[in-house]
Amino acid sequence: MAKGLLMTYALWAFGGPVGLHHLYLGRDSHALLWMLTLGGGGLGWLWEFWKLPSFVAQANGVQSWKQRPEEERPPLSLLRFASQMVVGVYFGLVALISLSSTANFYIVGLPLAVGLGVLLVAAVGNQTSDFKNTLGAAFLTSPVFYGRPIAILPISLAASITAQKHRRYKVSAVSETLSVRLYRVGLAYLAFTGPLAYSTLYNTAATINYAAETLGSFLSWFNFFPLLGRLVESVLLLPCRIWWLLVGAPGFNSSQFQEWEKLYEFVDSFQDEKRQLAHQVLGIPEGATNEEIHRSYRDLVKVWHPDHNRHQTEEAQRHFLEIQAAYEVLSQPKKPRASWR
């Protein structure tokens, strides 16, 4: 049956963040992705407004793209590659929070979670990728940074590159009933949310503490890249801020939600901690004016520029990078701390 554009827009408006319009159009992988990420943090859902006509046309012309020659490859998409990276990291963080206590987690659980996240994005729309090669790349990369949360990044990168290398169009498949499709999507959704829900509800304090440690370790790798660090912090805090926007009155009553409030405050506190460290690096007191910051930065750069310290190049390079990062942090206007009360 032909799909209607008006119905698609209606489902997008009223159930878009959970992928109702994608279920209607037969894009089950896209629907599952939206369910697990709330429409890509809301940004992907809004961006789709302009893409819905092409989605409907694709759904109505499903036979044409399923009959493409197998040797034809889809064009390379940087957006899809970046999405694979982000979702792979997201799946890895969820696995770290909910499954890290299991045996051989960093060799089996983590690469499996990251690889499945990458494959989910690879299967969006009329494309897919090679299951074995993508997961194989994830498992082969798992020993890099073994035992550390930062291991998520090389695993996700390797899996995303492999998925792009083996990208292809989906082949023709037998049409399935809606109940069968919903059953399969539901099982996948429960497989993702079940361990996380159990860990959260039955061991809330330990889960929050581990989440805080994991996020702290993960964010510490971005100290020398303040702009990227702020972007990562914003992405991590986005679900909390969306919840705050929806409920209207910040603050939680139950003890479990109060624990999550502490996690929000922990991640949000990185902004103040980075500014304090930046003041120490530049040797200026807190509350220093922009002129004082710039003067101290200029003086320190002259002292520690690698070209002026050829006898101690490595130490000079380290100090020079720290000074650059500190100046970049203090050059940005301080954001007001969000209050939950």
Swiss-Prot record:
Topology of this chain in the membrane: Multi-pass membrane protein
Chain ranges of the J domain: 277-341
Entry keyword Ribonucleoprotein: no
Gene Ontology cellular-component terms listed: membrane
Subcellular location, principal: membrane
UniProt keyword terms in alphabetical order: Chaperone, Membrane, Transmembrane, Transmembrane helix
Name under which the protein is recorded: DnaJ homolog subfamily C member 22
Keyword Transmembrane helix attributed: yes
